[in-house]
């Protein structure tokens, strides 16, 4: 038993010795192995602090990569570098905007420059020897394999095998926006623009002849340039760089103003236009593919391409485009481009697109210069000569053809000698704002302010007894076939004929009038549109005044026909003087008026005859005066001598003889200083009062007027006045504006007897000067609304006309004690109270 136990102990000891020896041997191998790796690590061209911390796998990986690089360098047949080249090598990486990477045909990174840490956050020894597919985006692997493939097939004659490579690669990046390094598991994707070529090395030349031929070594040499984000551009942009923003369809939504100096475009004219309109045609395919990569990978660099300048030629541009994503839904929002212009304008005299022809063919001078040259050019060019000139410049023909939507206006500057003046001035706009036509018909009146020649005579009217005279033509006069002298506030010297046969009236030229006005010390500004009108035959250049033109355009020319039936919200009190209800009277027809008898001289404050005249140049205003008649010889003598500057506006509505004497009625309670408001209707009212005395068969309006005028002002109730005003306003809105109506009377000029004048408070009035056959009798007509004018001016052959009562008169007047007396005001109220 003891012998068996001793044998077992011996076996145990021998096994322990063997194990110990094995452990020692393994320890020795590991130590030797470590020494070898240590020595090998120090043989690598790496810094000591890096090589001393490498594990065995990294040492082996880096050693293999080093050997491959040495093999490539030896196969390249590079000469030994001198000291100068060795010193320059350290500046290459600083000059590059990226890092260098060498890949084998399997995708192993044989070499990568040490500045990769600056752009990607990963160190050189962490990437060297690894497969590139371990650090790139999975969607880019297929494209990467295609780039690594070198096709050795037959090449067509005359063509070389394309070994150039340019593509975009998304690679892992451990750098944060603040420059810190994160874990590889949290890395983001960064777009690299990889450019380079495939290089094939033949390694058999340096190998000994042993009967074994190795395949050539293929590698891809790349320069990888990361594309900076527009928000993280560290280098400030110079004057040769401009920014632009585009929509997803590549249309400009913003452009930097520096493009004007570089390419000639204004930022405003690029907005809304596609960037493809400005690409050179030969670069469009390349840029289209680049834009596809941009939407796929987020960022691209276009490389150098040609972009068309505005006035011809092109410039070389390189663009870095970045897709900006929405932070909420991660959808693409817009595209921001940083454009680097790397050259000046090349072939600036060469046109590449239609957009460049717009700026080339556009004239430099302004539109005002063009219109001036168009109207001042007298000699006409031959059409054949013009056609020959245009054939030499075919590009200019595109500017001559009208575009869609253009308005074609035919300009005919040639005038036929046989063309009448009526046809030439057929469409001249007439500013009919002085004497207004009837509201019942649209009148075609040639006013004095229209630029009609003085030789044109008005058409003869129908019979003066026609009641439609006021509705058809209110300003045309039935006169002999003589030219009419037309006048307004502009002072003119008029020559009256010595005999009825010599009845032509001559106007002084506008040049003379303006000269006289300038020389007058108290020269006043024009007061009517007629002062801006010139004779067509006169020289417009000599009489053209800028001040007159400015005032002409300041005139109110809107209301061509103020009596048109249109609703207005204007208050009547803002348009006409206040006329109380108790001053109303029944309108009479014109045929019931009789010659007036003069009983007393007219007081200065009340004028019975409404006349219109022009005073001296110092006071060019229209006033109403009361005058008496003068003999024919005295009127002719004063007219011939041209001693009077007063211009009397007269008209001849009928052939009825006008009485030679005038008179006035007794002033009413509202006249003079007792009047609330000076009313222009007083004159006409007083004329009709005197007419009642001469016509026994007519209505006795004088008694009615006296009854109303005796009502004291303080007896009127304010409520009654307000109700009366409202009723009057409705009546005036229906019948027309009564403040235009003026009294009917005669105005004859008498030398030496000038009554005091009173300014009219209503609108401007226009009249004609007409000469009767005897040349002495003259009349004045003031136009009023057509409905009232028919009653005032309408001639009736029946002398026994019945009174015409309106619905308004029927409402407020109660006929008692005969039809001659109508109650008004308080008397009407008392009568109604008695009836009730």
UniProtKB/Swiss-Prot annotation:
Region called ODD, residue ranges: 401-613
UniProt biased composition (Polar residues): 608-620, 652-678
Domain PAC: residue ranges: 302-345
Domain bHLH: 17-70
Domain PAS: start-end pairs: 80-155, 228-298
Extent of Low complexity compositional bias: 621-632
Keyword terms, alphabetized: Acetylation, Activator, Cytoplasm, DNA-binding, Hydroxylation, Isopeptide bond, Nucleus, Phosphoprotein, Repeat, S-nitrosylation, Transcription, Transcription regulation, Ubl conjugation
Entry's Gene Ontology molecular function annotations: DNA binding; DNA-binding transcription activator activity, RNA polymerase II-specific; DNA-binding transcription factor activity; DNA-binding transcription factor activity, RNA polymerase II-specific; DNA-binding transcription repressor activity; E-box binding; histone deacetylase binding; Hsp90 protein binding
Endpoints of the signal sequence: none
Motif (Nuclear localization signal): 728-731
Tissue: Ubiquitous.
Activity regulation comment: Induced by reactive oxygen species (ROS).
Region (DNA-binding): 21-30
Region entry Interaction with TSGA10, spans: 1-401
Function: Functions as a master transcriptional regulator of the adaptive response to hypoxia. Under hypoxic conditions, activates the transcription of over 40 genes, including erythropoietin, glucose transporters, glycolytic enzymes, vascular endothelial growth factor, HILPDA, and other genes whose protein products increase oxygen delivery or facilitate metabolic adaptation to hypoxia. Plays an essential role in embryonic vascularization, tumor angiogenesis and pathophysiology of ischemic disease.
NCBIfam families: sensory_box
The protein's name: Hypoxia-inducible factor 1-alpha
The organism of origin for this protein: Mus musculus
Taxonomic lineage: Eukaryota, Metazoa, Chordata, Craniata, Vertebrata
Encoding gene, per UniProt annotation: Hif1a
